[in-house]
């Protein structure tokens, strides 16, 4: 059984390797630590599960735990939920993602801009793992009303959206996506550096 002091003694650089040697029986303890009020403990547990999910499918059985977090009153928990769902979409042979997508989409309207950003980035990972959902994901991203977003966050959020749409456009040909990207690049929210960044993705 993994001990808390052992968990917290792992350096950030060692986390990817540490995640490889976690036993399946220790995972339930680490998943429970996601609800810790202590930020450091919670974040360490999250990173271990995130790295573990990149290589093994034994975090996937906790999918419903992560889905419940999407509706948590705490924004950190909502972010943890969607990010771990995104990492485990690659293992989703039971097609749970289809049933969870609407809950994930709700976070695009989250009160916390950082949660909105993490949700958009997570949807990018989901789109990569689940190409059949690309059209729905793209549609929801394009429906985000930038006017309702805090002005200081508009550029960052629009860049996140365009990064995902640029990736989706590689496999999903859509006039709507092309038009949205074009209008966004000429809409005045992005600076020259950001525009160049997106243009490079479209090559």
Where in the sequence are the language-model features?
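Short inter-helical turns and helix N-cap capping residues of alpha-solenoid HEAT/ARM repeat scaffolds
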Residues: 37-39, 73-75, 111-113, 149-150, ...
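Residue-level detector of extended alpha-helical repeat arrays and alpha-solenoid scaffolds
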Residues: 11, 42, 78, 116, ...
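Non-membrane alpha-helical segments in proteins
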Residues: 40-52, 65, 79-87
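N-terminal alpha-helical scaffold/docking segments in eukaryotic complex subunits
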Residues: 1-52, 165-170, 178-203
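Alpha-solenoid helical repeat scaffolds
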Residues: 54-55, 90-91, 128-129, 171
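Hydrophobic, well-structured mid-protein blocks that either form specific transmembrane helices
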Residues: 72-121
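Amphipathic alpha-helical scaffolding segments comprising HEAT/armadillo-like alpha-solenoid repeats
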Residues: 21-34, 57-68, 94-107, 131-146, ...
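Structural signature of alpha-helical solenoid repeat scaffolds
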Residues: 50-51, 86, 124-125, 159-166
């Amino acid at each position: 059984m993994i001990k808390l002091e052992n968990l917290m003694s792992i350096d950030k650089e060692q986390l990817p390797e540490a995640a490889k040697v976690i036993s399946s029986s220790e995972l339930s303890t680490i998943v429970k630590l996601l609800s810790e009020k202590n930020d450091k403990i919670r974040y360490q547990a999250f990173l271990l599960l995130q790295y573990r999910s990149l290589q093994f499918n034994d975090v996937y059985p906790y999918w419903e735990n992560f889905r419940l977090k999407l509706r948590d009153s705490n924004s950190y928990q909502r972010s943890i939920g969607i990010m771990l769902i995104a990492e485990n979409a690659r293992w989703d042979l039971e097609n749970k993602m289809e049933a969870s997508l609407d809950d994930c989409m709700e976070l695009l309207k989250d009160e916390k801009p950082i949660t909105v950003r993490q949700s958009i980035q997570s949807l990018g990972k989901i789109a990569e793992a689940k190409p059949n959902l690309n059209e729905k994901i793209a549609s929801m991203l394009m429906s985000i009303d930038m006017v309702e977003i805090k002005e200081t966050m508009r550029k960052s959020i629009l860049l996140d959206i365009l990064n995902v749409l640029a990736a989706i456009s590689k496999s999903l040909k859509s006039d709507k996506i092309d038009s949205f990207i074009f209008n966004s690049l000429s809409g005045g929210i992005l600076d020259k550096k950001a525009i160049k960044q997106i243009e490079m993705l479209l090559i």
